[in-house]
Swiss-Prot record:
Family classification: Belongs to the tetrahydrofolate dehydrogenase/cyclohydrolase family.
SUPFAM superfamilies, A to Z: Aminoacid dehydrogenase-like, N-terminal domain, NAD(P)-binding Rossmann-fold domains
EC number of the protein: 1.5.1.5, 3.5.4.9
Job of this protein: Catalyzes the oxidation of 5,10-methylenetetrahydrofolate to 5,10-methenyltetrahydrofolate and then the hydrolysis of 5,10-methenyltetrahydrofolate to 10-formyltetrahydrofolate.
Protein name: Bifunctional protein FolD
Entry keyword annotation includes Oxidoreductase: yes
GO molecular function, one term: methenyltetrahydrofolate cyclohydrolase activity
Pathways per UniProt: One-carbon metabolism; tetrahydrofolate interconversion
Keyword terms, alphabetized: Amino-acid biosynthesis, Histidine biosynthesis, Hydrolase, Methionine biosynthesis, Multifunctional enzyme, NADP, One-carbon metabolism, Oxidoreductase, Purine biosynthesis
């Protein structure tokens, strides 16, 4: 068996075309969806992510504002800037690019963003609503993963899902979203005694650990759907995921590539949340 590639670029393109139409409809009603992004310091990966967000948002017709600030910025100055955006009706989404300098509390920043403008889906109120299965802003990468799984046409209900990784940004929330879809979810992490024992039972395997080629074919059930969230750069400069793609694609039924799998969906779902927030202002 050679796996069918789940094309994140194509799925993201379709979704972005739909969002562009929705943005145009909102503009005709006098509302231009606005996204404010705050970037502190000069982390190369963060700069690259922010450029991608700007390009995507503007291509969909959204208003995009970037505040690129020096790493010496104090926590209080950042919180005051967030307050300004919270109070500004032109902006429907506020995103503070992580990671932050060590002297700034990530928790304080996330909790300062208004839950109504928390398009990253990280605010405790929105996390709580997600746990309860209520309508809210879902974290972008997990929501993108669910979209990709839905594209396969596979019914998630009753499926054995194994999530390798338990970060607050991907691992924990993606498991919860799949639980909300009536899947049976197991989490594996650095303290899990025998990861293979769990991964070999997975109908759907989601890997988000940030370790190049961590999962090999002998840890994957025949015919499983494999979602690879990792993006790792080898010494050769090549980008690879957390799953050994060349091996795994001979065992899985569906697999996401790296790059071009989950990544394009993350920015797309950020735009989706921003448009959703803008629509709420008309309700």
């Amino acid at each position: 068996m050679t796996a069918t590639i789940i094309d994140g670029k194509e799925t993201a393109k379709e979704k972005r075309e739909q969002l562009a139409k929705e943005v145009e409809e909102l503009k005709q009603k006098g509302v231009t969806p606005g996204l404010a992004v705050i970037l502190i310091g000069d982390d190369p990966a963060s700069l690259s992510y922010v450029r991608g967000k700007k390009k995507a948002a503007e291509a969909m017709g959204m208003h995009f504002q970037l505040d690129h600030l020096d790493a010496s910025l104090t926590e209080e100055e950042l919180l005051q800037l967030i307050d300004q955006y919270n109070a500004n009706d032109q902006f429907h989404g506020i995103l503070v690019q992580l990671p932050l300098p060590k002297h700034i509390s990530e928790k304080a920043v996330i909790e300062r963003i208004s839950p109504e403008k928390d398009v990253d889906g990280f605010h405790p109120l929105n996390i709580g609503k997600m746990l309860l299965g209520e309508d809210t802003f879902l974290p972008c990468t997990p929501a993108g993963i669910v979209e990709l799984l839905n594209k396969t046409g596979v019914n998630l209900s009753g499926k054995e899902v194994v999530v390798v990784g338990r970060s607050n940004i991907v691992g924990k929330p993606v498991g919860q979203l799949l639980l909300n879809e009536n899947a049976t979810v197991t989490y594996c992490h650095s303290r899990t005694a025998n990861i293979s024992e769990h991964t070999l039972k997975a109908d759907i395997l989601v890997v988000a650990v940030g370790r190049a080629n961590f999962i090999k074919a002998d840890q994957i059930k025949e015919g499983a759907i494999v979602i690879d969230v990792g993006v790792n750069r080898l010494d050769t400069g090549k980008l690879v995921g957390d799953v050994d793609f060349e091996e795994a694609k001979e065992k899985a039924s569906y697999i996401t590539p790296v790059p071009g799998g989950v990544g394009p969906m993350t920015i797309t779902m950020l735009a989706h949340n921003t448009v959703k927030s803008a629509k709420r202002t008309l309700a």
